[in-house]
Amino acid sequence: MALFGKKDKKPAANLSGKSRLDIKVKKDGAEYTFLLEGRLDTITSPDLEAKINEIVGDAKKLTLDLAKLEYISSAGLRVLLGALQAMEGKGDMVVRNLTQSVSEVFDLTGFSNLFNIE
């Protein structure tokens, strides 16, 4: 199931050489934890969206660990919002370990009120 109805969307290529996002996925039954490291921006957000699309049908809990996320853009926020909407009625979604800069973006955009933050 695609988050936004786009089943064939391919991850964007890293053209800038500056944007990088490492995504590690840990699975425990139907609970998934995504550990994000780097930048979640226009270049890298399709990669996260694709990985979330792979698991959202089976997931009962989705945790995004942002302890090593340096930056998040509006494109990254869109992917997080899509994940939240996809998990609605299926299970829980938790965002944890926000860095100061990411926490400030969440506060400014109102995302702090939308997500279960640990």
Predicted regions and their residues:
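N-terminal leader/presequence segments that are low-structure
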Residues: 1-14
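Amphipathic alpha-helical interaction surfaces in cytosolic regulatory modules
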Residues: 42-115
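Conserved catalytic-core motifs of GNAT/GCN5-like acyltransferases
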Residues: 118
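STAS-typified acidic loop motif
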Residues: 11-48
